[in-house]
Amino acid sequence: VREVASGAFLSVGLKHGTVSSKQEAVKKGFEILEMGGDAVYCSHSIDWIEAMAKEGIPITAHVGLVPNRATWTNYRAVGKTADEALQVYQNVKDLENAGAACVEVEVVPVELADFITKNTKMITMGMGCGDVCDTQYLFCNDILGTNTGHYPRHAKKYIDLKAEEEKLQALREKGFRMFVEDMNSGGYPESKHEIKMDSIEFEKFQEKIK
């Protein structure tokens, strides 16, 4: 990705559960930066985020609807009640105090997202919470229309790439069927597809193997 997008800000995910200690997290964080990442997305514990941040690794944290914790809340907006909003905001301040540089704010009410953005030093990256965050993000399969499942309310499809991929797949299948039919009917290969050997050279070959 870095090779084709040299000017893009890349926050590379440290998949939840792939490391089992703060030391491993720090090591993996440095590996991500060495690969060309600008920041490390991390939804692990505050302690781990703090350990990575202390080593100078820019961390992108996550509040609101956090997919790997969705079994706690289901896939729904988070922060619509005063108590939930307070918990989300407290999470933001805890992450800020731990040294995170950015925070994804996902599927929270626009009022809460606006308040968070105005009251944190972190860069806020919003999805599903209006236009009040510092930056916006969407998943590429939503943008390009390759998502075969449910499209969330906040998503916007710009291109129906799935339909184009289905057309391409139909053409692939058609091409393979044409090849099989052509081969079975004797239409392929034709003489123009063959490599010819000089007759004298072929005679010499036959002499050599006698």
Region locations from a protein language model:
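Alpha/beta enzyme core
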Residues: V1-K210
